[in-house]
Amino acid sequence: MLCEGAGVPIGVVVDGANRPDMRVVQPTLESIPVKRPAPTQRFPQGLCLDKGYDYDDVRDLVREFGYTAHIRARGEEAQAIKRHAGFKARRWVVERTHSWMNRFRRILIRWEKTPENFLALLHFVCALI
């Protein structure tokens, strides 16, 4: 799922849970249905990703789409916890969006057999959010 800064979903892709995150970056970026404004010096467009996306291929792909990648390196958070006793992990906006989506029981547990039906339900829920 791809969401904007306030947590509104703007792109959704359905894929298997056992698939590496880096494999769904391109389909997710291509799933944005509206044309976004071009990034400017004053308003650069960043893309915050977690450690599962910390690969050069992902960084190159994100750059091709015109985003600035903000990816926390593997092990960086663990080092910050060791250095600062009161350090708390940063909560990503997309995690909050996932919790909003979990209010809809129909998508919390996937009962649909085809990915097309499940994707349609996801689009419906994203429109409601």
Regions found by a protein language model. Give the residues of each.
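Charged alpha-helix within mobile-element recombinases
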Residues: 117-129
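Acidic, contiguous segments within the catalytic cores of piggyBac-derived transposases
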Residues: 14, 89, 125
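Active-site beta-loop-alpha junctions of metal-dependent nucleic acid enzymes
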Residues: 13-38
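Generic leucine side-chain signal with a strong bias for well-ordered alpha-helical environments
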Residues: 2, 29, 47, 119-122
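Short, contiguous, pocket-lining structural segments
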Residues: 2, 17, 54
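Helix-centered, glycine/charged polyanion-binding patches within enzymatic domains
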Residues: 36-115
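Short phosphate-engaging motifs
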Residues: 9, 21, 54
